[in-house]
Amino acid sequence: SAGVAYFYLKLTEVTGNAEFAEKARCGLSYAAAHWRDLLLPEQAAFQDNREGVPGVHLGAHMGVGGVGLVLIEGAKTFAESKDAEKYRRAAQAIGRFYTDESAQQGESGPYWTGSPALLMDGGIMLFLIALYETFGDQQLLEFIKAAGAQYLRWSAESPRGGVDFNGAGIETPFDWPNFAFGSAGSGYLLAHLFRITGDARYLEVARRCADFLDAVAVPQKRGKLIPHKLGGDDEFTVFYLGYCHGMAGTLRFPTLMGTLDNDIRWATMVNQLADGAEALGAPEHMSAGLWNTVCYCCGHAGMAHTFLGLYCIDGSPRWREFATRCGDILLGSMKTHADGSASWPFAWERVHPEELSQRIGFYDGAAGIASTLLELFMLERDDYHWPRMIDDPFPEDPRR
């Protein structure tokens, strides 16, 4: 319910519609009351098995931390409402779950799943940073610092160059280097750790994550792209373009670094990744890493959101046009029903493009797709304003 509630939050912010606000409150209230249901053995097993990632139910994208992030946004949006306190208390309860109940003790500090992936421990830390910055708690900041020290222990010098954080697991024969599981996401977290602590170690290791990404980047006809996977038969051959394992997520890392570190390499990296995506024919043409999927996680909704973010930075018509072209594809792939509702049939799994589903969630379905269409609507109306979560480094408003 959290992702759908977040969509209704956005509808409320844009339209001021009381019916949408009530739906958002209902979803948020349910999430506040039932977030622990994600920890029930049968529910945790279902979530982990569905995504094929053990421990994902604890993380920040498809687990408990994601519920906490949405509750924080609910407390902000409904700050003048009596419900805001309920959402705040629930978000802080999730914070205590991470600090007091589920944390394990490593050699240098606390951790949870043992995976540095943003989908796992990295995302949990992003949630805790957001919680600290929203409500303030010096004790929580000290906990984050200790967890950051443990996180640094998971870095590994790569023979390819730079530093690697392999969220796929140390025992696996392959490496996912992009945003949700790899060094791009780890570098992003480290940049935030530097931002809130001022500890230069985090900035230095983040730079070395970028060195690793540069070392494994594959030149295209124009620009470069980071492979979906390192190791295995399809190494260096599949390039996702979406948020999870591809360009739309990975370029968030250099975007954030560009706000903290005055080095031209960050803008260059952003442009190279965008060039690489267009060199593969995106957004209109499918490729090995852009199959018949349009969702926020893997497809056109996530790409449009990212390019709208880039447009907010410099106002380039190029970014706006790319996002609009993605929006055209979202509208063209929409299925309308007799009752006036709409859904999007697409293939969630790249390796099973024939298996279509009509999911409703934010990362994996209609809520995220419709949110992106809402952004494009505001862009056309010339009143674009999009408050950002912590995994979203772009300005809230376009540069004027």
Where are each of the predicted segments found?
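Glycan-recognition and catalytic cores of secretory/periplasmic carbohydrate-active enzymes
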Residues: S1-R400
